[in-house]
Amino acid sequence: MSIDIEVGTKVTVQVPASSANLGPGYDTLGIALSLYDTVEVEVTRSGLEVEIFGEGAEELPRDGSHLVVKAIRSALKAADVEVTGLRVVCTNNIPQSRGLGSSASAAVAGVAAGNGLAGFPLSEEQVVQLSSAFEGHPDNAAASVLGNAVVSWTTVPVDGRSLPEYRAATLEVHPSIKATALVPDFHASTQAVRRVLPSHVTHADAAFNVSRTAVNVAALTAYPDLLWEGTRDRLHQPYRADVLPVTAEWVNRLRNRGYAAYLSGAGPTVMVLHTEPIEEAILDDAREQNLRVLELEVAGPVSVERG
């Protein structure tokens, strides 16, 4: 039997941005970053009210099709609770469709909010599962739920009838590692960027990426001097260069200077993981080319306050 949540119940969620792939770890590696969206949700007597401020405020829907609302309802259904109405206020700082996990953060915020409204009946693993289901892969969502860096994976049932299972394990990132994002002023479609990938790759390229993904994990956790080697990739970035030429140019430029730069998610953001500051002349040049420079820390997990 479902239970109604009392009118006036409120939660505030702060969810970090994320960067996926980290070079070789396609649909597997993710890292949470100190750039946050905030979602405030209150149970009302009836209806749905959605307010949006900040990034995407002019484009995002203000009805039940908003991803945060869909994710809230998904969590409430999983918790077997109901609400009479909702007021949802989104304050977005994560750039939309730039490869910083904006959609995953919205899904995580919604699921975390729904779980908070219900009194936190869902486990961390269930929050990862529900959030990742909106994405179809867990790298971004798991990073935003769990914080730090994650190794994630998807198990597809052999019967073809059950839903995929999304899992993740947290990595404690070495305290010296920072992140700097160079964010272009244009969007990238995840679907369009995925379409350029080949259906088959060579055994040599597959082996190369397996080894570099392992190096990446070692670099993140214990050997940050290996970050450059651990962000090399042959699986997806070379194929995406033609559709993201500005990104590819900056990734190559930075890597040629010894920086561990890579395409963040589906782009177009360029991410650099580093232990020493990036040369200011490079950052100034990026700004002159209309790239937004974000100097970030590794973030902790999504936070939820109920009251």
From Swiss-Prot:
ATP binds at P95, Q96, S97, R98, G99, L100, G101, S102, S103, A104, S105. GO terms for cellular component: cytoplasm. Its EC number is 2.7.1.39. GO terms for biological process: threonine biosynthetic process. Pathway: Amino-acid biosynthesis; L-threonine biosynthesis; L-threonine from L-aspartate: step 4/5. It is an enzyme of class 2 (transferase). InterPro entries: GHMP_kinase_C_dom, GHMP_kinase_C_sf, GHMP_kinase_N_dom, GHMP_knse_ATP-bd_CS, Homoserine_kinase, Ribosomal_Su5_D2-typ_SF, Ribsml_uS5_D2-typ_fold_subgr. Keywords: Amino-acid biosynthesis, ATP-binding, Cytoplasm, Kinase, Nucleotide-binding, Threonine biosynthesis, Transferase. Coiled coil: none annotated. It comes from the Bacteria. Catalyzes the ATP-dependent phosphorylation of L-homoserine to L-homoserine phosphate. NCBIfam families: thrB. This is Homoserine kinase. It comes from Corynebacterium aurimucosum (strain ATCC 700975 / DSM 44827 / CIP 107346 / CN-1). The gene is thrB.
